[in-house]
Amino acid sequence: MKLNRVVVTGYGLTSPIGNTPEEFWNSLQTGKIGIGEITKFDHSEFAVHNAAEVQDFPFDKYFVKKDTNRFDNYSLYALYAAQEAVTNANLDVEAIDKDRFGVIVASGIGGIKEIEDQVIRLHEKGPKRVKPMTLPKALPNMASGNVAMRFGANGICKSINTACASSNDAIGDAFRSIKFGFQDVMLVGGSESSITPFAIAGFQALTALSTTEDPARASIPFDKDRNGFVMGEGSGMLVLESLEHAEKRGATILAEVVGYGNTCDAYHMTSPHPEGQGAIKAMKLALEEAEISPEQVAYVNAHGTSTPANEKGESGAIVAVLGKEVPVSSTKSFTGHLLGAAGAVEAIATIEAMRHNFVPMTAGTSELSDYIEANVVYGQGLEQEIPYAISNTFGFGGHNAVLAFKRWENK
């Protein structure tokens, strides 16, 4: 069987630190975080007061007012990011084989705001007043369907939910679909819009969220004073193609996807394995498929949620696989935690880091926990060559998903 090389030819996103790749990368370079006081609902009775909300979402660019009746925000975010990715890739969707054009949009929670709104309506006004579009708007697979319908993609179409590992698993699935010849083009990523009372209350009940009042110190991965993650929102979508397909249409290639590792801790519903056993295996699998040695990896975009449990295990896993020298940073210090969309947005961050040979700092972090042995970049970013990089994501349920990328050098 012929194995195809898989390349990234475009991406788009909406995020707390930018609604274009250029805005997003500029924020990562200059240290502009997207965390602030929650504005989406009254949080006065909550212990949590900060989130990372999408700012200045360009709704009017692709949507009209009635679209809010058809799409939950998580679908709107995915549709926006998908259109931006297709445009960024200069992809003429009418000129490609639609049967070999697939879509995967991951989401950890889906349309939770729609569910919350309609449950309130149910209790206040009765069952006959629940809106007909409630379930279609809320279903976590609907963003994939909506994106496929927007572009007429008749190939693979699915949604993946492995909690906070969802987007990396989606990209890994798309990568393999092209590598093994099932598709030519995949529009893939993740989307989330979960800054809602119920979602915040639920994660608050788990003591998973940061209760720090100062936004600049709310998401501080690997720091000794970290006390939880900051809820973020947004979407990232990438265009993946076989190298042959991309070259045939004269596409600009941004990076190559070279490896994917997926494992399960099978340990605990919400806590990662304390020694990072699943994370270690996932990183090793990604490197094995990429056919690279640990010494070739020059940057790790860490899962780095700013929770006490995650960073201890992840730091140990990184050191076990890659050693103590490879630069590590967490862009969740800028964006908060986008749950099911985290991997896609962080894949874009990783590729941008490779393209610019610059490791973004871990913003807000000032003093590492004593047991953190990984080479965490904080205080300022780091200029260095990045020929290969990996991006880690781990999720509730013990899910571990790791992607390996290669900088594109026209060969």
Describe every region a protein language model picked out:
Residues 1-67, 244-254, 348-362, 406-411:
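ACP-dependent fatty acid/polyketide chain-elongation machinery
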Residues 10, 28, 82, 103, ...:
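Conserved small-residue
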Residues 125-131, 172, 176, 194-248, ...:
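Glycine-/small-residue-rich "gating" segment that lines the acyl/pantetheine channel
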Residues 182-227, 260-274, 304-311, 325-375:
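Acyl-CoA/ACP chain-elongation machinery
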Residues 5-9, 32-36, 214-290, 299, ...:
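Condensing-enzyme catalytic core mediating Claisen C-C bond formation in acyl metabolism
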Residues 22-29, 113-127, 177-180, 200-213, ...:
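A glycine- and small-aliphatic-rich helix-loop capping segment at beta-alpha/alpha-beta transitions
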Residues 78-91, 140-143, 148-153, 157-192, ...:
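Active-site-proximal alpha-helical scaffold in enzymes
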Residues 8, 29-162, 191-200, 294-310:
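Conserved beta-ketoacyl condensing-enzyme motif
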